[in-house]
Amino acid sequence: MLADYAFIGVFFIGAVIFPLVPLVAAYFLGPKRPTPIKLDTYECGLEAVGDIRVQFKIQYYLYALAFVIFDIEVVFLYPWAVAYGQIGLFALIAMAIFLVILVGGLVYEWKKGALEWV
């Protein structure tokens, strides 16, 4: 029984090791002498002009979060739409519940004024 799921453990270990190897190699093999130029702020290859720290309005964050939520919705809808003929009525009901929950969240955001641009 445990051997059937061994590939998940191997996949997890590989998923941890794969990004760590280049990071550890860069740490040990890379130069350790930061110069003032390396510590300077980089802005598209040009000298930084004005204040480097710019505060963004929270509305950008809310719009980005709403975009990600509804983008993930499309990721879930696409495979369902492709396999709809094979999975039947239960999948239709499950997806309808999923969409009702997401639309309910959108209506809640709208009523709270999160989508109003100020």
Swiss-Prot record:
**Source species, domain of life:** Bacteria
- Give any Gene Ontology cellular component: NADH dehydrogenase complex
Q: What class of enzyme is it?
A: translocase
- Disulphide linkage map: none
List the InterPro entries.
Answer: NAD(P)H_OxRDtase_bac/plastid, NADH_UbQ/plastoQ_OxRdtase_su3, NDAH_ubi_oxred_su3_sf
Q: Which reaction does it catalyse?
A: a quinone + NADH + 5 H(+)(in) = a quinol + NAD(+) + 4 H(+)(out)
Q: Where in the cell is it found?
A: Cell membrane
EC number(s)? 7.1.1.-
- Major place of residence: membrane
Q: Which residues cross the membrane?
A: 6-26, 62-82, 87-107
Q: Is Cell membrane one of the keywords?
A: yes
Q: Name one Pfam family in it.
A: Oxidored_q4
Q: Name one GO molecular function term.
A: NADH:ubiquinone reductase (non-electrogenic) activity
Asked whether the keyword Coiled coil is assigned, the reply is no
Q: How does it sit in the membrane?
A: Multi-pass membrane protein
Q: Which UniProt keywords apply?
A: Cell membrane, Membrane, NAD, Quinone, Translocase, Transmembrane, Transmembrane helix, Transport, Ubiquinone
Biological role? NDH-1 shuttles electrons from NADH, via FMN and iron-sulfur (Fe-S) centers, to quinones in the respiratory chain. The immediate electron acceptor for the enzyme in this species is believed to be ubiquinone. Couples the redox reaction to proton translocation (for every two electrons transferred, four hydrogen ions are translocated across the cytoplasmic membrane), and thus conserves the redox energy in a proton gradient.
Q: What quaternary arrangement does the UniProt entry report?
A: NDH-1 is composed of 14 different subunits. Subunits NuoA, H, J, K, L, M, N constitute the membrane sector of the complex.
Instruction: Spell out the family assignment given in the record's similarity comment.
Output: Belongs to the complex I subunit 3 family.
Question: What is the protein name stated in its UniProt record?
Answer: NADH-quinone oxidoreductase subunit A
Q: Which organism is it from?
A: Roseiflexus castenholzii (strain DSM 13941 / HLO8)
List the gene name: nuoA
